[in-house]
A protein has these predicted regions:
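Structural motif
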Residues: 15, 77, 116-123
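The feature captures the hydrophobic core positions of alpha-helical coiled-coils
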Residues: 5-8, 15
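Small-residue helix-packing and pore-constriction motifs in hydrophobic alpha-helices
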Residues: 9, 20-73, 82-93, 103-114, ...
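ATP-dependent adenylate-handling ligase core
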Residues: 96
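Juxtamembrane/start-of-transmembrane alpha-helix segments at the extracytoplasmic/lumenal side
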Residues: 13-19
Length: 220
């Protein structure tokens, strides 16, 4: 909890420095009703995360890594935890570990940020991608959602598979984007995605999201 408090203080300092002229958005992040909503969301998300974990140790470890990913990328912990929870069972069926699920989650989350996806678009991609993993293949509506809102994810997938981006649609239509190809391809590009995102300027919105995550982390 001390670590969470220190993280919160750090995030508060950063966002105060960058939030000049955006007092409305800053105040909204600390509205009592919103904080209560965050607490409820924390409980709900972690209930799903526990169900997706095979042990209490795995739950605790995954929870902390997901929070680290969220704070590093300025993305909502709830979105990242939801992707992990939805994908874990199906990925295990294909022989992947919890660490692999976390890496794919980070690749998707980082790719969405680089792509400039809105909250609604990111939510749609997370839902469709997790459904694709459950089916064992990325195609149809699932591929279209990622292709439309997560351009950087699609380019990373193409690079990881060693094919041209333009060829992915035909591969998706032919059912060739199977989980055993998609997962390692995305994981192989994680370092590139991290470096690319690290070079991007942080926005006020990113800062507010980090503060919201930090409030949630007080329960860690």
């Amino acid at each position: 909890q001390r670590r969470a408090l220190a993280e919160l203080n750090s995030q508060l300092t950063e966002i105060r420095a960058s939030a000049a002229g955006t007092a409305g958005a800053f105040a909204g992040a600390f509205a009592t009703g919103h904080l209560i909503s965050l607490a409820d969301e924390w409980s709900s998300v972690n209930a799903r995360l526990k169900q997706a974990s095979q042990s209490s140790d795995e739950f605790s470890s995954s929870q902390k890594v997901l929070m680290d990913i969220s704070q590093r990328t300025g993305t909502a912990f709830s979105d990242n935890a939801a992707l992990f929870a939805r994908s874990a069972a199906s990925m295990r069926e294909y022989g992947y570990s919890a660490d692999d699920v976390l890496k794919v989650t980070e690749a998707i989350s980082t790719g969405l940020k680089i792509s400039g996806a809105s909250t609604a678009e990111a939510g749609s991609v997370i839902t469709q991608f997790s459904q694709a993993l459950a089916q064992g293949v990325l195609r149809g509506e699932e591929f279209n959602s990622v292709n439309e809102s997560g351009d950087r994810i699609v380019r990373a997938l193409a690079a990881g598979m060693g094919v041209a981006r333009k060829d992915l649609k035909a591969m998706a239509d032919d059912g060739k984007l199977t989980a055993d190809k998609v997962v390692p391809a995305l994981i192989s590009q994680l370092g590139v995605l991290r470096d690319e995102y690290a070079a991007m300027p942080e926005t006020v919105s990113d800062g507010i999201t980090k503060v919201e995550n930090a409030f949630m982390a007080l329960s860690l």
